């Protein structure tokens, strides 16, 4: 059974955040485009463990799957429903900075996430007049939503996550559908949608290259 939380002050009024231990429940339908994000102990996928996977169908609700290692009484990578969704070729996974997320999900769960879209890549392709491509900036400027980043560096490996942590985690997926709609319009306007789609198809391979140590120096650098 999942734990249901309401966090109107941290996200938006009426938002439902559902916390699931270990895996998504059977029969959950999140639609054809699913916003996804991850929380980890750090930014090194070889060292830092995956702690939380957040998902949203774009309906104002968020589902958070807490990944608990077997050494701490959990099930580790035994999350068949989550992995089935991540690998489902008929469900698009929508990320912000997919490069990191697809790498950590491959490393932690052994799953290749596809197909994917990335709002950060899309923003960099069309918002060439600015360096503001972070999620907070994009949501404020394109969607009119101001999210808090106060819990960004908190302890995501804690056995019990606080309502504030879950509200922060949920905010990273609740508005991605709306953001993508704006960015897709800009990609079409600037004639760069096909280029963006080519970049998105490459992202799983980019994540695998990073895991193999090709991120520094970058294999595409001179």
Explain the meaning of each model-derived region.
Residues 1-222:
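DEDD superfamily 3′-5′ metal-dependent exonuclease/proofreading module
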